[in-house]
């Protein structure tokens, strides 16, 4: 997905003989720590495995009375935290502004959209397929959602987005890049903010390995010009740099999830043997909401 060296630099690589990385939730069956008892539900970096052993400081005890334990991997876990941090700290939202987020029904995008609505912004989503757009509007409360697969070019998508955002775009939460980025950039208002969380449309195309794909290189001067002329603030971030704020995130969001104010949607695949297929589907945009594997 990424050049291997780049992943290793971020601490995300997997050795040839290693266990595929990933967070997991489960029940303690043995413990040598006073902080955890047998039967406790925990979340930790166990990877793709049925059992795991982990140092106590790397675990988080879960309260199943607040929300299903699976939410520790989604709305109350790293994805939700990513959306919260990017929106609140880098988006710097102001009531009455317009926000656009791609991958709007995923656990990050749906968090961003709901926070925007709660803060008094217009939330416009972009997703792949009519069913996902319906989910964005009906379940997550977006004002509108555009199906990017219905538009052949970024120019066509831009025209539809301009109609949905008559006052321009103040915050674009970047999850996908590619055609969507090229559509949004000319619509950004002066002083706009772009938190960069992901670039998923480029991961399989080679564009991040030094080979421009689909005209991305040709459009680069126009993108840079927009950044300059519009005085845009663009911030890439890796959420693992900001774990010190995770407790603040939980204190804010957990009560809102328990009250039904922040909603979530899970796409559950049964069986660890089906995890590779589920991952491929995720990268191809086939999942709805947070992709999970249930053992």
PLM regions: where:
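Short glycine-centered segments of the SAM/dcSAM-binding site in methyltransferase folds
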Residues: 41, 98, 122, 192-193, ...
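A glycine-rich, Thr/Ser-enriched phosphate-binding loop motif common to dinucleotide/cofactor-binding enzymes
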Residues: 64-90, 95, 101-105, 150-151, ...
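N-terminal Rossmann-fold NAD(P) dinucleotide-binding loop
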Residues: 109-110
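C-terminal capping/lid region of NAD(P)-dependent oxidoreductase domains
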Residues: 259-268, 276-295
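Adenosine-nucleotide cofactor-binding segment
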Residues: 117-183, 240
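Glycine-rich beta-strand-centered segment in the early N-terminal region that forms part
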Residues: 2-48
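Short, well-ordered loop/turn sites that connect or cap secondary structure elements
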Residues: 35-36, 93, 188
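Glycine-rich phosphate-binding loop and adjacent beta-alpha segment
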Residues: 179-262, 295
């Amino acid at each position: 997905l990424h050049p291997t060296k780049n992943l290793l630099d971020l601490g995300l690589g997997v050795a040839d003989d290693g266990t595929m990385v990933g967070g997991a939730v489960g029940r303690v069956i043995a413990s040598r720590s006073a902080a955890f008892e047998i039967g406790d539900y925990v979340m930790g970096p166990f990877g793709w495995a049925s059992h795991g052993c982990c140092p106590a400081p790397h675990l988080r005890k879960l309260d199943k009375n607040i929300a299903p334990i699976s939410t520790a991997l989604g709305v109350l876990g790293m994805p939700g935290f990513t959306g919260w941090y990017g929106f609140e700290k880098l988006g710097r939202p102001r009531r009455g502004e317009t926000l656009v987020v791609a991958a709007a029904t995923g656990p990050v995008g749906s968090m961003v959209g709901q926070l925007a609505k709660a803060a008094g912004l217009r939330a416009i989503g972009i997703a792949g397929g009519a069913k996902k757009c319906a989910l964005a509007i009906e379940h997550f409360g977006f004002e509108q959602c555009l199906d990017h697969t219905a538009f052949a070019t970024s120019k066509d998508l831009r025209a539809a987005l301009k109609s949905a955002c008559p006052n321009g775009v103040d915050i674009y939460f970047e999850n996908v890049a590619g055609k969507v980025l090229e559509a949004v950039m000319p619509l950004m208002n002066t002083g706009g903010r772009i938190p960069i969380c992901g670039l998923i449309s480029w991961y399989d195309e080679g564009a991040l390995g030094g080979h421009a794909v689909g005209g991305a290189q040709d459009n680069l001067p126009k993108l840079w010009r927009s950044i300059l002329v519009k005085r845009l603030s663009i911030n890439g971030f890796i959420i693992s740099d900001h774990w010190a704020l995770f407790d603040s995130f939980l204190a804010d969001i957990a009560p809102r999830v328990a009250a039904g104010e922040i909603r979530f949607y899970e796409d559950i695949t049964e069986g660890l043997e089906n995890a590779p297929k589920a991952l491929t589907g995720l990268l191809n945009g086939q999942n709805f909401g947070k992709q999970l594997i249930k053992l």
